[in-house]
Amino acid sequence: YIFDNDRWGRRFQAALARAAQRGVKVRVLIDDVGARYSLPSIVGKLQRSGVETARFMRSWKPWRFRYYNLRSHRKIMVVDGQTGFTGGMNIRASHVLADRPAHPVQDLHFQVDGPVVAELQRAFASDWLFTTGEELAGPDWFPELHPLGLAVARGIADGPDENFDKLRKVLLGALSCARRSVSFASPYFLPDQDLMTALKIAVLRGVNIEIIQSQKCNLKMVEWASKPGLEELARSGCRIVQTPPPFDHTKVMVVDDSWVLLGSGNWDPRSLDLNFEFNVEVYDRELALEVNELLNHKKARGTALQPGAGNGFPQLRHLRNSVFRLFSPYL
């Protein structure tokens, strides 16, 4: 989604250029809006260095404004058709906490191996064909892949080009199947009524629901709009844990210590209805326990949102939050 023209973006650009010079087939697809998070965009530098680069859904021409909200939020990298990377991380300096950036962002990204890598590649190839007209096919892009372990995984490519709401149905299905526990982190939390109801019903069935959120969101209007829903869920028995800075951009969900959902999707209208997203569901107890350990570390640093009238906020803030909640489909 985002590929910034900063120190780390330029390091990626240089590495990609060296790969292209070695004869590696390199294709880079950046969302048109995501490419403009830093100006000048890094697209020109990539193209001038010999890296085949394209912008997804260019929407700045007046006759294309109606497509402005349809963004590719996917974060996919595939190497030699055999090793994949996906999760929540963009290419920008703010993700490198060791450099002490001015606006640090904590995130979680995964390396993926085995047959599921072909599903990452298919999602990219489909977007590349749509954008450029070039078809990526053959063993260079899709080599034969063999199982490497016991985990069962499936890629979930979702977007507004389909009538079947895959991400929403996966989330609803996971909540309905949960028997003991559900833990998840989502930086932007604006679930629709179906998901709100599913969370409440899971609590009534005795499922322990824990939601991890940053105390301060990098998008203020989203933070305000999310507060009424979080307080409503806290009153219904969900445990809401708010973590201190840095801002946590992690997107991951664990159910019953056996199922993990990872990828780019948030619990908000953009991910559920407007964006092109890519997630991976994994049935693997070892991975689930590892992710839960990370989530437990986050929870240990945070504080629980206490349910109750006002939750200590002045009434004017409640009015502001409720008003912004009305606009959540547009945030």
Task: Give each language-model segment a name.
Residues Y1-L331:
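Charged, low-complexity intrinsically disordered terminal segments
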